[in-house]
């Protein structure tokens, strides 16, 4: 027999030790059964049985108090096998945690896209009301039309207020999940070795710049990228389909025209 024990022999040794421990437990159980089987008066049977069990448990308790914890086996191969099994359990738990984090990231991306879609819809509605307002200014306003105009104006104010709340909610969402990158390499994108520039802007500001450009000059919606645009944020927006590059100039980007 060689000095080293194969994993199969280690398992067999571990099983033998477990069987020995089980036999000792069976002996203790047999002793308890014999104690419980002693004849007692029928009237005191339950009390005597309970007292016997109490004494047995108390004796077992004192015995365990005197014992020190023991390893199941001192065989290095057995301990190595048990350690490998424990590592496999830890690995599975970590894989489950990783899967949960990935699902959460996907959910955050979906929430961002949904918030952007809601914002674009409100921009469309606001632009439609602005067009109606301009057309009505060119016409002769009658009393009835004044009332309609006032109602539309109130609705437009409500939409502006709703847009403001929506922008605030979007800003809070982006600040929570996409904060400004920290210096000294503490940014979210660890694969970027260089530190972020001093004047880097948030992802919320990037979207606001692109949105203002699209609304003010829809015929020229592109914005030139400078050092204040942090590359990881640009990649995230490009991968999500929220931002598009200029077909001829990669340094210029625009907001996706979701309303078209």
UniProtKB/Swiss-Prot annotation:
Keywords: Centromere, Chromosome, Coiled coil, Kinetochore, Nucleus
Function (record text): Component of the CENPA-HI complex, a centromeric complex involved in assembly of kinetochore proteins, mitotic progression and chromosome segregation.
Pfam short name (any one): CENP-K
Similarity comment: Belongs to the CENP-K/MCM22 family.
Coiled coil regions in record: 84-173
GO annotation, biological process: kinetochore assembly; mitotic sister chromatid segregation
Subunit architecture: Component of the CENPA-HI complex, at least composed of CENPH, CENPI, CENPK, CENPL, CENPM, CENPO and CENPP.
One GO term describing the cellular component: nucleus
Lineage start: Eukaryota, Metazoa, Chordata, Craniata, Vertebrata
Protein name: Centromere protein K
Transport recorded as keyword: no
Domain of life, per lineage: Eukaryota
Localization per Swiss-Prot or TrEMBL: Nucleus; Chromosome, Centromere; Chromosome, Centromere, Kinetochore
KW Nucleus (keyword) present: yes
Originating gene: CENPK
Primary subcellular site in the record, as a coarse category: nucleus
